[in-house]
């Protein structure tokens, strides 16, 4: 067992190794099973050292994380600047940086900056150039269309064309789309040749709405899946009254289901978060879980949850209790 895990693994079993490198779909990019999301880096963090982006990225590197995700929208460029600065001491060939396009910051800096939707060919090129400047890097590895929910025609037309040109010319290694819905991602899978998808919140222990259509398409077409929102806005971190699901207060129905999942986990002496973060890896299309954190402590907890020894009986109970569809793969083949 690698020394870096001896302090965070229960027993001698390691169900999921956060540092394991996996090829991302049909692309030539490999990502660590645990990836670091830069969403929180666009907001104010704890003032002490543990809360700094540099400390979080350093600890992530020690754990074995090599895939780092950001976007212009996160803090209106602040996340990209912080991620670029924090990764500057690591060799470019050893790290994987992903960012997103589809929103230009106008003006590019200053107190009046606002995000402006733009999935045009020129808009994509400008967005990437500005992201590279903010991060002070020459290139990124993965480039996603960011939440094109109301912009299908432009994103799938000129936007996709721009991404394809960037991939073909070697400016980026992989192209994808990141969304909080699965229906449009399934359409991208059918009508384009994207390499990967960032699926946020739609393939989790609580919500498997991507299972029926999107996930089979990804398996069939070798599209790598990056899972975001594994705790569904916090409800799978603690399903208490007032918990959030999909960025808003959870309905009684979602809260009740999350509490049933928590009860199954409690019977098997397993944290709900451990089951939640390990669940997606049972699907063959899933390469990595992307998790945003605000402190080194949160990062270490995610690594512990990923490496926790989840009993096989827990997965069987989840199936028996009807908490996932019969067609849903579970760890260990249960």
Model regions and ranges:
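Active-site mouth loops of central-metabolism enzymes
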Residues: 39-51, 110-123, 152
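N-terminal binding-site loop/beta-alpha segment at the start of enzyme catalytic domains
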Residues: 1-95
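Conserved, mostly hydrophobic/aromatic
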Residues: 24, 36, 68, 83, ...
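Beta/alpha (TIM)-barrel catalytic core signal, keyed to glycine-rich beta->alpha loops juxtaposed to Asp/Glu
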Residues: 3-13, 18, 52, 148-334
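Short, acidic/polar
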Residues: 47-60, 119-135, 180-187
């Amino acid at each position: 067992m690698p020394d870096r895990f001896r302090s965070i693994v229960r027993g001698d079993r390691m169900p999921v190794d956060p540092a394991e490198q996996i090829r991302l779909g049909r692309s030539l990019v490999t990502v660590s099973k645990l990836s670091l999301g830069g969403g929180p880096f666009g907001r104010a963090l704890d003032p002490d050292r543990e809360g700094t982006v540099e400390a979080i990225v350093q600890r992530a590197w020690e754990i074995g994380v090599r895939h780092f995700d950001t976007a212009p929208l996160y803090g209106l460029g602040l996340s990209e600047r912080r991620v670029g600065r924090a990764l500057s001491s690591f060799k470019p060939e050893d790290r994987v940086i992903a960012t997103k396009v589809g929103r230009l910051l106008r003006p590019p800096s200053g107190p009046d900056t606002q995000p402006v939707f733009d999935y045009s060919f020129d808009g994509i090129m400008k967005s990437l150039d500005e992201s590279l400047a903010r991060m002070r890097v020459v290139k990124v590895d993965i480039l996603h269309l960011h939440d094109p929910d109301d912009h299908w025609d432009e994103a799938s037309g000129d936007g996709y064309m721009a991404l394809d040109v960037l991939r073909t010319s070697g400016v980026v290694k992989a192209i994808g789309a990141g969304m909080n819905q699965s229906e449009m991602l399934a359409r991208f899978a059918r009508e384009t040749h994207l390499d990967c998808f960032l699926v946020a919140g739609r393939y989790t222990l609580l919500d498997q709405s991507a299972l029926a259509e999107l996930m089979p398409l990804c398996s069939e077409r070798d599209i790598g899946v990056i899972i975001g929102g594994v705790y569904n806005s916090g409800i799978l971190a603690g399903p208490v009254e007032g918990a959030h699901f999909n960025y808003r207060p959870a309905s009684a129905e979602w809260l009740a289901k999350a509490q049933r999942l928590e009860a199954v986990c409690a019977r098997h002496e397993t944290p709900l978060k451990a089951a939640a973060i390990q669940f997606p890896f049972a699907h063959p299309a899933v390469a990595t879980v992307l998790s945003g954190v605000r402190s080194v402590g949160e990062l270490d907890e995610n690594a512990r949850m990923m490496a926790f020894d989840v009993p096989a009986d827990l997965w069987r109970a989840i199936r028996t209790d009807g908490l996932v569809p019969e067609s849903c793969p579970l760890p260990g083949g249960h």
